[in-house]
Amino acid sequence: MARPTKFRRVEFFPEDDYFVPCGKPKCQIEEIALKVEELEAMRLKDIEELNQEECAEKMQVSRQTFQNIIDSARKKVVTALTEGKAIRISGGHYTTKLCKFKCAECETIYEINYDQDRAVCPSCGSDKVMCNKKAGFCKNWCKGNNIE
């Protein structure tokens, strides 16, 4: 049985999500789907000029997973450019839903993806953790278990 795919952390969303070669009508063109996390991987590596380890850390994936994501992204972009295909940026397995938690036992403050991660302190393993609600994403999820 395969492990579930971890959400990739994404900080940037483009205003434009569809690119077509000049002079070709949309209705007569093949398109390639570039995942949101693939665009993020290229942005971190090629525009922000971070090294692989820094990119992987920002996206909260392993270095190998980051390399797989960016390899896939670059192949798609090069294929679209050389074969005159459109690029649609959509889909993927990503999140921006991060929330800061604080452990009541050891007072460690850390971020979690509340769609995926369990609310257990990564430092001491305690389940006595609370959302500080400052991120604003999880107001409905926390339901009063907050610290101010």
Swiss-Prot record:
Belongs to the UPF0251 family. This is UPF0251 protein Cbei_2962. Pfam families: DUF134 (PF02001).
